[in-house]
């Protein structure tokens, strides 16, 4: 009887702790904005303020054309000369030429529903795409084609992708951008099997110029200096073998603790 009483107390404490975590999680979820459970969950994961955007996934730059892509829409802006003006640009949406409304300051807006979150600010040698984010996507017209402006005003002839999968790209903003940082870190672990890159080196290895990802999370002025995951940090710093060993110790600890709490 004495042994069963101790086991029951241990089980009750563990169960109460687990229940408190679950109830607290649902309470926080219910406090979020939204009329339905799915809306509340989405606002918890991604943030309501990010909904009214173009949801940019990739940017293609060629000699004459800047192409912006999301899951359903492609906006292309083409120029045949180095001097830019709204009247000299050609705009197409999903392959169909469209005519923008042009304001006095050179801002182009569009009547198409797919482009309701798109504005193009035309300047002498550049286009600024205001897509509903905290900062615009900046592109510059040069003699040999277009370049995008990246971190630290770096001029990019191509905008690098962290991952080619659109499904994964659409998940980048979730968990306050952590999904992007995790995918970014995993993409650079190919040479970290035995030895890692060393501590405090993450900032030098991550893709810092994935502009669509940065726009969808915070802005194009944000640098990432850590994976925001203890496990990925270990793999990147000291190697994947080191991570596997630590995970083995953690699993052993959890199994032994579970047996101690509920088992014989």
Range-by-range predicted roles:
Residues 5, 33-34, 257-262:
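Membrane-interfacial segments
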Residues 240-264:
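Hydrophobic transmembrane alpha-helices and their immediate junctions
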């Amino acid at each position: 009887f004495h042994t069963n009483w101790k086991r029951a107390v241990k089980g009750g404490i563990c169960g109460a702790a687990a229940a408190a975590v679950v109830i607290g999680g649902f309470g926080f979820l219910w406090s979020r904005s939204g009329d339905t459970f799915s809306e509340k969950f989405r606002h918890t994961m991604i943030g309501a303020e990010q909904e009214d955007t173009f949801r940019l996934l990739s940017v293609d730059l060629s000699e004459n054309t800047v192409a912006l892509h999301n899951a359903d829409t492609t906006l292309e802006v083409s120029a045949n000369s180095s001097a830019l003006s709204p009247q000299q640009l050609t705009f197409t949406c999903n392959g169909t030429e469209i005519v923008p409304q042009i304001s006095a300051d050179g801002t182009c807006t569009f009547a198409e529903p797919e482009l309701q979150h798109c504005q193009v600010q035309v300047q002498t040698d550049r286009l600024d795409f205001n897509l509903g984010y905290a900062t615009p996507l900046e592109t510059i017209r040069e003699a040999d084609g277009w370049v995008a402006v990246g971190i630290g005003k770096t001029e990019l002839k191509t905008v690098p992708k962290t991952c080619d999968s659109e499904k994964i790209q659409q998940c980048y903003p979730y968990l306050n951008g952590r999904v992007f940082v995790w995918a970014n870190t995993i993409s650079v672990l190919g040479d970290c099997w035995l030895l890692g890159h060393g501590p405090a080196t993450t900032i030098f290895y991550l893709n810092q110029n994935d502009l669509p990802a940065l726009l969808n999370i915070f802005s194009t002025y944000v640098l990432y200096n850590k994976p925001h995951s203890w496990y990925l940090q270990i793999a990147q710093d000291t190697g994947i073998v080191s991570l596997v060993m630590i995970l083995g110790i953690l699993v052993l600890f959890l199994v032994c603790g579970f047996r101690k709490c509920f088992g014989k």
